[in-house]
Amino acid sequence: MSNTQLSYKDAGVDIHAGNELVERIKGDVKRTNRSEVMGGLGGFGALCALPTKYKEPILVSGTDGVGTKLRLAIDLKKHDTIGQDLVAMCVNDLIVQGAEPLFFLDYYATGKLDVDVAASVIKGIAYGCEMSGCALVGGETAEMPGMYHEGDYDLAGFCVGVVEKSEIIDGTAVKTGDTLIALGSSGAHSNGYSLIRKVLEVSGANPADLLEGKPLSEHFLAPTKIYVKSILQLIKQTEVHAIAHLTGGGFWENIPRVLPDNTKAVIDESSWQWPAIFNWLQEKGNISRYEMYRTFNCGVGMVIALPEKEVETALALLEQSGEKAWVIGKIEHLGEGEAQVEIQ
């Protein structure tokens, strides 16, 4: 038996560092506040009232991470935008059902807390929340010695939104003849990064190598685009039948999630050009066209189905919101034995 008096810090957990982190992020968190949020940071639970404008409010929840994009961010020591990625992955899933994000919580876990790194990450989370109009109401910072390699950390996000019951977008309104509009992505977003890292490995490429005047690292770590405000505006002013968020599974798996069983999406491949980074990945990794569309968004972050009569208005609204938007295809009747997504 040792006579040495042990403390939690001796075991690798620095409560002082955790408190310092909270102080560092308070201002960033405060900027995300909504009038419905009651109280501040530090409570055992976060309180949030429902916005009074909703007659029959339905809560919509989601949780996500950023996959192995985090590995790339850690290796390249770029921590300031991965938080935006985390928020985007959650709120973009909520908006496809027409939900306005209300509040967000994060989970940050590491072996030894580096306050500078954690503060940078959480500032990015707060910025993503500001862009989404949702409040960062709390989170968990877990310092767990022996659980992670030195310098590593993990992230998860949790978001709750609200939608009027009569205005839920679930794809049931999709009809043959509907038009499909694409919203451009900012890059690979937060999907396909295990394949991206494999391509970097087998090609021997250096992340500092330039592509179209920018280092590959900038292309790969470009933060995921947040579509909340532009899509909320679109929903208010047009009749939207379905929205698909192109994440893991790409075109082949995400678009069918919002289509009735008797319909298919016919995508016109000539309607857009892949951003250069996707051509680079396909060439350097010798990746098939099918695999590209299954793994990556290939420049398309969202696909929106709406009646043909709404197209002109929708494109104008989206352009005003700063989105790159175009007609990418249409909805047709699904024949026997056909796939629900055709890319022609």
From Swiss-Prot:
GO cellular component, one term: cytosol
Pfam families assigned: AIRS (PF00586), AIRS_C (PF02769)
Family: Belongs to the AIR synthase family.
Name of the featured protein: Phosphoribosylformylglycinamidine cyclo-ligase
UniProt superkingdom: Bacteria
MF terms (GO), sorted A to Z: ATP binding; phosphoribosylamine-glycine ligase activity; phosphoribosylformylglycinamidine cyclo-ligase activity
Organism encoding this protein: Haemophilus influenzae (strain PittEE)
Enzyme class (EC, first level): ligase
Keywords tagged on the record: ATP-binding, Cytoplasm, Ligase, Nucleotide-binding, Purine biosynthesis
Annotated EC: 6.3.3.1
Compartment list: Cytoplasm
SUPFAM superfamilies per the UniProt record, alphabetical: PurM C-terminal domain-like, PurM N-terminal domain-like
Coiled coil: none
CDD domains for the chain: PurM
Record field: catalytic activity: 2-formamido-N(1)-(5-O-phospho-beta-D-ribosyl)acetamidine + ATP = 5-amino-1-(5-phospho-beta-D-ribosyl)imidazole + ADP + phosphate + H(+)
Gene Ontology biological process terms in this record: 'de novo' IMP biosynthetic process; adenine biosynthetic process
Keyword Ligase attributed: yes
InterPro entries in UniProt: PurM-like_C_dom, PurM-like_C_sf, PurM-like_N, PurM-like_N_sf, PurM_cligase
Pathway: Purine metabolism; IMP biosynthesis via de novo pathway; 5-amino-1-(5-phospho-D-ribosyl)imidazole from N(2)-formyl-N(1)-(5-phospho-D-ribosyl)glycinamide: step 2/2
HAMAP family the UniProt entry points to: AIRS (MF_00741)
